[in-house]
Each structure stands twice: as structure tokens, then as C-alpha cells.
Design a protein with these regions (language model features):
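Hydrophobic beta-strand-centered segment that forms part of the acyl-chain substrate-binding groove
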Residues: 4, 68-107
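Short aromatic-glycine motifs in intrinsically disordered, low-complexity regions
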Residues: 8-18, 79-81
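Hydrophobic residues on conserved beta-strands that form the core of alpha/beta folds
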Residues: 24-25, 89, 119, 133
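Compact, glycine-rich, soluble single-domain proteins
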Residues: 50-69, 86-87
């Protein structure tokens, strides 16, 4: 399903996070296998330091992209959105931290899903520039 759903258009229905800890502005595309989101970094973001989004902020944005996919799947199945946790971060690589005002575009693609555990590859770009990759192991609770 491809669409542009912005923060004022029900992203809160798909992810459990709430302001000021929401790191997605737009859900560009979502399916059972992947999600594509965007986030323009505001100066007052809680994980901004010295004009840059922190590594923790990059990781949280990737995790929320994964949560958007999971929330969409849960909604398609008639379920409520479940709370999820990062169980492991593997192979996190960054070329730089993004600056305030830049827009992150992150794709999360499911590698493996077993019951409530997902292994997801995440790629984050600013424009055409690849700035971060990681593999997240995520768990949801019932």
C-alpha cells in the first residue's frame, strides 16, 4: 500500500509511541514485508545534541519504522497495535549523524518473522546519501 500518511493523519494509530517521542512524520509505503517512512529532524527533538540527531535517535527512528509496519499488519488483522521492544541491534553502521532540518528516509524490510519476534534490516538515507544501516531484532508483547 503506497500513500503519504503524515503525523496529523493517524500515525498514532499504527505506533505505540507518543510525543515527544515520535520519530516519524510520514509513512510513505507499508506492506507485510516492509515499511518506508520519513522524519524531518526538529531542533527541539529530545534526542538532538549539538545540532545533530544522536545515534540513539537514528536507532529509534529505525525501530519506529519497524513499529509502523507491525502496527499496519496488526490493524489489517483486526488487532490493536502492540508494544514492541528492541531485543538486539546487529551490525549498526553509520557514516554520519544527521543534522537538524534534514529529512531521514528509512526502509525497514523483514528478513525473518517467527511468532512475535522479527528480524528486520533497516536502511536510512538523507536524500540519496546512505547514512545508516542496521539489523534489529524486535519483539512484541500481547
Amino acid at each position: 500500500m503506497t500513500f503519504g500518511m503524515n503525523a496529523t493523519h493517524n500515525i498514532a494509530e499504527w505506533i505505540p509511541q507518543r510525543p515527544p517521542f515520535v520519530f516519524i512524520d510520514t509513512i510513505v509505503d507499508v506492506s507485510e514485508e516492509h515499511a518506508l517512512t520519513q522524519f524531518t529532524i526538529p531542533a527541539d527533538c529530545v534526542l538532538v545534541s549539538d545540532g545533530c540527531l544522536s545515534l540513539a535517535g537514528l536507532m529509534e527512528h529505525a525501530a519506529q519504522t519497524c513499529a509502523a509496519r507491525a502496527g499496519w499488519v496488526q490493524r489489517q488483522q483486526g488487532q490493536q497495535v502492540k508494544i514492541g521492544y528492541i531485543g538486539a541491534v546487529k551490525q549498526m553502521q553509520t557514516t554520519r549523524l544527521p543534522h537538524v532540518g534534514e529529512t531521514l528516509t528509512t526502509e525497514a524490510r523483514v528478513i525473518q518473522q517467527v511468532l512475535n519476534i522479527s528480524l528486520v534490516d533497516c536502511i536510512t538515507r538523507v536524500g540519496d546519501e546512505l547514512i545508516a544501516t542496521t539489523t534489529l531484532k524486535l519483539a512484541t508483547i500481547d
